[in-house]
Amino acid sequence: MAKRDYYEVLGVAKNASDDEIKKAYRKLAMKYHPDRNPDSKDAEEHFKEAKEAYEMLSDGQKRAAYDQYGHAGVDPNMGGAGGQGFGGFADAFGDIFGDIFGQAAGGAARGGRGGPQVYRGADLRYSMEITLEQAAHGYDTQIRVPSWVSCEVCHGSGAKPGTKPETCPTCHGQGTVRMSQGFFSIQQTCPKCHGTGTYIPEPCVHCHGSGKVKETKTLEVKIPAGIDDGMRIRSAGNGEPGINGGPPGDLYVEIHIKPHSVFERDGDDLHCQMPIPFTTAALGGEIEVPTLAGRASFPVPEGTQSGKTFRLRGKGIKGLRSSIAGDLYVHVQVETPVKLTDQQRDLLKQFEKSLAEGGARHSPQSKSWFDRVKSFFE
């Protein structure tokens, strides 16, 4: 039988918010929960269907894949609608009902009807600060990150060498215990074995029964040219180890770009403030500016005013998703001279006098501004 559209299952629009999706799921789960419909196969199927839809649409990456490719874009085994029974109910509803039952929603492994389940390890995040030049050109580097690895003494079992884990007497190897409150009855992680289905009578002294030890490892990281602030680089399999033999999580290296002394980045474009002498602004000339690839020069026309912006095409950054480099925008600031000599003062006074004799043609903006002020007070 073909699967129904996940949005149709929850009864929400395709542009529904996360909160709307959660509310719709909660309503359906309360309506079709097996403990409220113990003899209804139809209710059981509706509950599984709603649970699968919620797990897909509440995850940003899975939802994006589903929106683009439909059911073919997501792994149906990740939905939890297969042979897990209802062992995943507490997982899916932990954030909604955790406060009702006094439990914290988390990633701890929960067992199912078929015994302890395997769980993928948690992802880790590493924050890396790089320069604008490194972001623009890319480079290879190494990072040292703390990591959990399998204990070499007990080979990950957590048990003292010569002994082995035993079946948990509390959950009888299931990894979960059932908890009831009012008309709700849900499965919780077993408090004795923490979801593994086994307990360790004689823990390994090296790892204290955890089966893993912490160590620092060195990883090679390739920073691609054009990366921007806030982007992440995925290092597959370098996260936390899995639970009950599950696959490890991933490490995400989050990039932060240091402020630059000259440039400000805006996407693929760069901006810089360039002071120029007032003589160059008045007479025009050639000025030289720095770029990430070296130096570049461009002509400044005579009569350039402070704040004028010049665009140098292709002198920005070629972003990760761009086929061409961005532009460099040079914002010129006309610099007023200071600490003048007497001779320089006299020359400027003569210059000022000549400007006054020339009238508005030398200072059109000033003339226009004074005219507006005059009309304002009339």
Swiss-Prot record:
Q: Where does Zn(2+) 1 bind?
A: 151, 154, 204, 207
Q: Which cofactor does it need?
A: Zn(2+)
The CR-type zinc-finger regions cover 138-216
Q: Tell me the compartments it is located in.
A: Cytoplasm
> Does the record's keyword annotation contain Acetylation?
no
Listed GO biological process terms = chaperone cofactor-dependent protein refolding; DNA replication; protein refolding; response to heat
The J domain is annotated at 5-70
CXXCXGXG motif repeats sit at 151-158, 168-175, 190-197, 204-211
Write down how the cofactor binds this protein: Binds 2 Zn(2+) ions per monomer.
PROSITE patterns noted in UniProt? DNAJ_1, DNAJ_2, ZF_CR
Q: What is known of its domains?
A: The J domain is necessary and sufficient to stimulate DnaK ATPase activity. Zinc center 1 plays an important role in the autonomous, DnaK-independent chaperone activity of DnaJ. Zinc center 2 is essential for interaction with DnaK and for DnaJ activity.
Against NCBIfam families, the record matches this protein to: DnaJ_bact, PRK10767.1
| Family in the record | Belongs to the DnaJ family.
Protein name from the UniProt record:
Chaperone protein DnaJ
